[in-house]
From Swiss-Prot:
Keyword hit for tRNA-binding: yes
InterPro entries tied to this protein: Ribosomal_uS7 (IPR000235), Ribosomal_uS7_bac/org-type (IPR005717), Ribosomal_uS7_dom (IPR023798), Ribosomal_uS7_dom_sf (IPR036823)
Subunit structure: Part of the 30S ribosomal subunit. Contacts proteins S9 and S11.
GO biological process: translation
Protein name: Small ribosomal subunit protein uS7
GO molecular function: rRNA binding; structural constituent of ribosome; tRNA binding
The keyword Membrane belongs to this UniProt entry's keyword annotation: no
Pfam families named in the record: Ribosomal_S7 (PF00177)
GO cellular component: small ribosomal subunit
Signal peptide interval: none
The species this protein was found in: Azobacteroides pseudotrichonymphae genomovar. CFP2
Function according to Swiss-Prot or TrEMBL: One of the primary rRNA binding proteins, it binds directly to 16S rRNA where it nucleates assembly of the head domain of the 30S subunit. Is located at the subunit interface close to the decoding center, probably blocks exit of the E-site tRNA.
C-alpha cells in the first residue's frame, strides 16, 4: 500500500473549447502519446455529430456533454468478502470516477463498433449516447440493474 495519496495533476484546457473535460477525454482516447492525432479524431467526430444532429439547437460540445451525462453511472457493485461468502455490494461512485467511467465506456464501445475511421465510430457512439442508446448506455443500465439486484447487501458498507 502506498504511503501517501498521490497529488492530482493539473489538466490543461483544450485550445478550441477551453474545457478541461475535453482534454481529459482526449487523454483517454490517445494512443502512444499521439495527442494531436487524438484531438483531430475528437474534433472531427464532433463535426460529424453536428452534421448528424443538425436539427438540434445545442452546439456539438453540449451534445457531447449531454451524451456523457446520459451514460454516467450512479452506482456500482464492489466485491466484499464476509465470512467465507463474497457479496456484490452496491456503492455510490464519487464524481471524478463517474466521469472517468463514462469516458472510458464511450471510447471502449466506440472502438468496438464497425466503421471506417475512429472519428466515424466515436461520432456514432456520441449520437447513440445522446439518444440513450448504444453500448455505453447499455453498460450503464447493466451496472444499475446489478446494483438494484444486490440492494439487499447494501448494509455491508466499505
Amino acid at each position: 500500500m502506498r504511503k501517501a495519496k498521490p497529488k492530482k495533476r493539473q489538466i490543461l484546457s483544450d485550445a478550441v473549447f477551453g474545457s478541461q473535460r475535453v482534454t481529459k477525454f482526449v487523454n483517454h482516447l490517445m494512443y502512444d502519446g499521439k495527442k494531436s492525432m487524438a484531438f483531430n479524431i475528437f474534433y472531427s467526430a464532433l463535426e460529424k455529430v453536428r452534421a448528424k444532429l443538425s436539427d438540434e439547437q445545442k452546439s456539438s460540445l453540449e451534445i457531447w456533454e449531454h451524451a456523457l451525462n446520459n451514460i454516467t453511472p450512479l452506482v456500482e457493485v464492489k466485491s466484499r468478502r464476509v465470512g467465507g461468502a463474497t457479496f456484490q455490494v452496491p456503492t455510490e461512485i464519487y464524481p471524478e470516477r463517474k466521469e472517468t467511467i463514462s469516458m472510458k465506456n464511450m471510447i471502449f464501445f466506440a472502438r468496438k463498433r464497425d466503421g471506417k475511421s475512429m472519428a466515424d465510430k466515436l461520432s456514432a457512439e456520441i449520437v447513440d449516447a445522446f439518444n440513450s442508446q448504444g453500448g455505453a448506455y447499455k453498460k450503464k443500465e447493466d451496472m444499475r440493474k446489478m446494483a438494484e439486484a444486490n440492494r439487499a447487501f447494501a448494509y455491508f458498507r466499505f
